[in-house]
């Protein structure tokens, strides 16, 4: 029965992602917002809902390893797994402004989380405290404000001759209510389907006696990132690879700054199962994204390298679990 549910949930994931991206593209055309910003603000935040749910429940149950491990693992999978898979089939192109702001911002919050979690500033036990969380929440608000402000400034700088093209895009977008319905409906189907998938996968893993830290870094992290994977592939299929990148970067920032920021307000997140290696791999993932994207394009072979890094990290976790 579990296998039937897994197959049905995968079908739901595919259809939900397609509707979510289609609706998001229409909204982007209506408001003349860049694909990257829509990917970060609507798709990235929306598809991170499963991560928020898992981390909140982990915090409420006093299981910081699940709360933090879910975010760290998801962020690693987002870059190495999702962008790796997407770039292998569809080279990901994006604007140089994203290389100057959003991606470095993502590197910065990843480093900051590591410093907070390892208590670099006060030298006590590994813990993301309430003050740390408030700082992270403020950083998320700053990121969203700057993203939309910079995008608006860019639009105002567009030359007059490009306006007709933008208007034609807006006309093709269709009624706004249909776009909003697609986003809400697609996101609902996507999250529900992913929830079914993760629940079944975790039950199977626990039957083999796997610990919480390992499950949160692998099965839960990858499972809750399935919406991002499906949305990124759907965006790439629609020739919106910039939206796919925005989805990943926005999701990573949202996961750290808002999800862990809010979760730490429920209870300080003291974690011992998530190691320095896990945080280092998370930082290395976004640094690799910056390095590969210096020419504003992630090539197919670079996608292969990213995905191989994910396989290597997963193998490390498996061998460490066995040991």
Which role does the model predict for each range below?
Residues 1-323:
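Hydrophobic alpha-helical segments, chiefly the membrane-spanning helices
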